[in-house]
């Protein structure tokens, strides 16, 4: 990856999908902590989706709410991320959903990358 400084503020980088703008100021791009939280949430959600599909658990939607706790005394360090999955479907087996979330946690590379430095917790709700 290569990051190029923007004249006004922040940096850009290019990926096959498109150009990504990153900056400490939301006027100029995504903030680094937003990208980190998004990476963890979407990685774990994507892994969970694959696990549910592989187990043939029929669901119609999966949403993730992420609550972030930051420590302003330590440069805004991310201390905790709570992921709340909202899974829509009929007659979803709660025990299999719980086990699938545990499996997703073990197989999400982004979550595993921060496991010893950021507390990550998960809950879910069936809708």
Please provide the spans of the model-predicted regions.
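Extended beta-strand/beta-hairpin segments
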Residues: 1-38, 46-127
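Alpha-helical metal-binding/catalytic segments enriched in His/Glu/Asp
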Residues: 43
């Amino acid at each position: 990856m290569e990051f190029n400084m923007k004249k006004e503020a922040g940096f850009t980088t290019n990926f096959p999908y498109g150009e990504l703008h990153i900056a400490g100021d939301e006027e100029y791009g995504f903030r680094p902590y937003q990208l980190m939280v998004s990476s963890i949430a979407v990685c774990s959600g994507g892994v969970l989706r694959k696990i549910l599909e592989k187990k043939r658990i029929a669901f119609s939607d999966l949403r993730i709410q992420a609550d972030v706790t930051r420590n302003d005394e330590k440069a805004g360090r991310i201390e905790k991320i709570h992921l709340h999955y909202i899974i829509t479907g009929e007659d979803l087996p709660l025990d299999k959903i719980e086990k699938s979330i545990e499996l997703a946690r073990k197989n999400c590379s982004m979550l595993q990358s921060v496991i010893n430095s950021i507390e990550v917790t998960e809950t879910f709700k069936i809708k």
